[in-house]
Amino acid sequence: MQDERRHYQGRVSELAIVYLGLGSNLGEREENLCQALTLLSRKVSLEEVSSVYETEPVGYKEQPLFLNLVCRVTTRLRPEELLHLAKEIEARMGRIPSFPNAPRPIDIDILFYDNKIVKTQNLIIPHPRLQERAFVLIPLAEIAPDLVHPEMEKSIAELANDVKGQSGVRKLTGGFDVSAICGRAL
C-alpha cells in the first residue's frame, strides 16, 4: 500500500528540495548549461551542481554528443510552476518542440521534487525514465548517492551502479565551477 502522504497535494508552504537534470547538445554546450543555471537561479535557490558529463545521445543517435549535469535546488514553486519555468527557459534559449530525443540547445527535466510522487497529464515525478538513464543517474549519484527513489525504494547509488550505458558517460576533467564558467557566482 502506498504512503499517500508522499503524493503531492498542490500546496507548498516550505522549501522543497528538487533535483533537476540539464542537458545540451547544440551550440555552445557549456555556455548553454551556464545560461540555464543563471536563469534558473533567478527563481530558485541553486544549492549544488554536479560535474559535467559528456554523453552519447539516447534514442536518436544521429546527433552531437550531449553535455549533462544535475543540480539540487530549493524552491517554493509548486511542481507545475517549476515545469512552466523550465519550459519557459528552454523556449527562451531556442528549443523548438520537435520529435522525442531530438537535438536541443537545452533540456531541463524535473527528476525529483522532495520525496513526492506527482502524476498529472503534463508532469510525472519522479522522472519516468530516470532509472534507465546513465546520463542522469551518474551525475545525480555524485551529489545525492543516498537519495532514495520513492517508488523503486532504491538509492540513486544503487540505480547508477545497475544502469546500462555507463560507458557512454564521460566525466569532464576539472568539474563544473559555476563561478569560473559563468564568470560570477550564482
Where are these regions (language model features)?
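N-terminal beta1-alpha1 ligand-phosphate binding loop
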Residues: 4-43, 50-56
